[in-house]
Amino acid sequence: MNFPCIYHVYSIRKIMFLVIVACLPGIFAKYYFFGIGTLIQIFFSIFISLVLEIIILKIRSKNIKNYLQDTSLVLTSVLFGVSIPPLLPWWMTSIGLFFAIVVAKHLYGGIGQNIFNPAMVGYAVLLISFPVYMNNWNERDFSLSFFNDFKKSAYIIFFKNDITTVSSSYLNIIPDAFTTATPLNNFKIKSHLKDDFFLKENIIKNKEVSIQTSWKCINISFFLGGIFLLFTKIICWRIPISFLSSLGMLSIITYFYSKELFMSPQVHFFSGGTMICAFFIATDPVTAACNNVGKIVFGIIIGFLVWIIRNYSDYPDAIAFSVLFANMTVPLVDYYTKSSGYGRNNI
C-alpha cells in the first residue's frame, strides 16, 4: 500500500546532503566563470551562519547539537553564498545572513516554522540596501593562478571593497556595466539608454556574447543538478515544471508580440537565478505549498511574478522577490487547493 503522505525514505540530514551535492555543478560553473570568490563566499557564509545559529540557540536555551545535526543551516548558507556576487564585502554577507538566520528563521520559531525562504530574505535585504554591489559580477581573470586568484579575491572581500571604489566604476556605464552585469542587467541598460550615442553597438554585442555564455552554462549546470534531485525523488516535479512552464509561456507570447520591449525565452531561462530557483529555492518544503495542486499553483505564481518584475521593474532579476511574494500566498493556496480526507471521494 502506498501512503500519500510519504514521498521518500531519506532522513533530513541525507536530503540536505544530496541537495548540496546537486548544487556542486552550478557551484563549479560559477567558480569557473567568476573566480574563487564564489567559494570564499560559500565557506564564509557557512561560518557566519554557524556562529549566528549557536548564539541564537544559546539565547533560546536550545540543544545546539540536536539543532545542528540536520545540516539545513549548511544548505541555507550554500544557497545564499552561491547567489551573491563573488566579491561582495564580508560585512554585507554577514548582514544578509543575519536577516536570513536570525530574522527569517529564528524569529518565526526556528527550522520548519519559518514562512519565508531564509536565503531569499537575506538576498532581498542586500539587493534593496546595496543594489550597486549586488549587481557587481566581475568576470574571472583567467591569467591568475589558483593561489593568486584566492589572494586577490580574499583581499577585495575582506579589506578593499569600499562603496566609493565600486560606485565610481559604475559611473562609467560603458564598458564597465557590461563587464560586470548579467544579461538581465544588459537588457535593462539598453532599454534605458538605447538612444545614447555613447553606446557602441560592437561593444554591447561582444560583451553580451561572453556574459550570456557564462550564465547559460551556470543555469544549465543547476538544471543538471535539479534533474538529479528529481531522479532521486528529493523534490517533486510540480513546482519546477509549473514555474518554468508559466515563465516560458508568458515570455514566448510577449517576445513574439514585441522583441524590442520584452526579453526572449532564452534570456529568461538561462540568465540570473532561474534554474537555481526552479530546483533548489522554490522547492523548499517548509515555505512552499503542501499539496499537489497547490504546488502547481505556487510554481505558476512564481513564474508570473518573475516575468512581471523582470519586464516592468528596475530590478534586473526577480527571483528573491518572486519567491518571497509567493511564500506569502502559501496559506491561501493551501486552503483553496486542499484535497478531501484520505479515503474519501472528492465532491
From Swiss-Prot:
Cellular compartments per GO CC: plasma membrane
Membrane-crossing segments per the record: 15-35, 36-56, 84-104, 114-134, 217-237, 239-259, 261-281, 289-309, 315-335
Pfam families from the UniProt entry: NQR2_RnfD_RnfE
InterPro entries on file: NqrB/RnfD (IPR004338), RnfD_bac (IPR011303)
Stretches of the chain forming a coiled coil according to its record: none
Taxonomic lineage from the root: Bacteria, Pseudomonadati, Pseudomonadota, Gammaproteobacteria, Enterobacterales
This protein's record includes keyword Nucleus: no
Function comment: Part of a membrane-bound complex that couples electron transfer with translocation of ions across the membrane.
Disulfide bonds: none
Cofactor(s) the record lists: FMN
Assembly behavior: The complex is composed of six subunits: RnfA, RnfB, RnfC, RnfD, RnfE and RnfG.
Residue(s) carrying FMN phosphoryl threonine: T182
Keyword Disulfide bond belongs to the record: no
Protein name (Swiss-Prot/TrEMBL): Ion-translocating oxidoreductase complex subunit D
UniProt record similarity statement: Belongs to the NqrB/RnfD family.
Enzyme Commission code(s) on record: 7.-.-.-
Subcellular compartments: Cell inner membrane
Entry keywords, A to Z: Cell inner membrane, Cell membrane, Electron transport, Flavoprotein, FMN, Membrane, Phosphoprotein, Translocase, Transmembrane, Transmembrane helix, Transport
Bilayer topology: Multi-pass membrane protein
Superkingdom of the organism of origin: Bacteria
